[in-house]
Amino acid sequence: MEFTKSLVKGKLIKRYKRFFTDVKLGKEVVTAHCPNTGSMKGLLDEGNDVYLLPNNDPKRKLKYGLEIIKTRKNLVGVNTHMANRIAQHALENNLIKELKNSDLIKPEVFFNKETRFDFLIEKNKQKSFVEVKNVTLFRNKDTAEFPDAVTSRGTKHLLTLIDAIKKGYKSYLLFLVQIQNMEKFKIAKDIDNEYYNNYLKAKKAGVNFLAYRCDISSKKIFIDKKLKIIDD
């Protein structure tokens, strides 16, 4: 996925009220929209390099959106709205080995009245649901982790993926690691032990878990490598 415009580099001052980020651009301080309402654990140190996407829409008050943060020498894609676009690009271009050559790729499909999964795919008449989780947490140099905060919604998705298997679907959960240089992935059970336990339950029930790393630059983000999932 290529960015629609060239990104502008600045220095992070602070993020506040979940949706706002103050950034120093040269001698000017601007407020950018933060398209990530999560904890963004480990990413928000003052002085970190950030990359903003300019916005010329007169209807929008904020003229920049936060896309990338550089921390501990790694670029991290923080726009959660990009995750599904990156995943769809990967599905359509056969970048995910386990999901190659699908006959149908349909985004945002309801499984029941309460739950909508990110994708429904079909291959050889077998239908599969795919849920995508954006990953931005890393606490050592080569291991990405999820979640970065307690996620009841994430736990609900795990249990619903199990329900989908019982109704004849295949279920996949794709951890989309928007962090440079990662080689492994694991569940952050110290952050959300309930999620970890339900992850193990879902794995035993037949949910397929995948972790893929993105190649990130100020011009584009795309899936480039499968990561090993570690179960502690």
Which stretches of residues belong to each language-model region?
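Flexible glycine-rich surface loops and low-complexity tracts that mediate binding to linear polymers
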Residues: 48-57, 213-214
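OB-fold/S1-family single-stranded nucleic acid-binding modules
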Residues: 57-74, 224
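Short aromatic-glycine-enriched beta-strand elements
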Residues: 17-22
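Acidic-basic catalytic patches of nuclease active cores, encompassing PD-(D/E)XK
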Residues: 41, 74-106
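Short nucleic-acid-contacting surface segments enriched for D/E, G, S/T with interspersed K/R
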Residues: 38-51
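Conserved catalytic cores of phosphodiester-cleaving nucleases, focusing on short active-site segments
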Residues: 10, 117-148, 161
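Domain-level recognition of nuclease-like catalytic cores that cleave nucleotide substrates
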Residues: 178-232
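Nucleic-acid nuclease catalytic cores
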Residues: 142-152, 159-191, 213
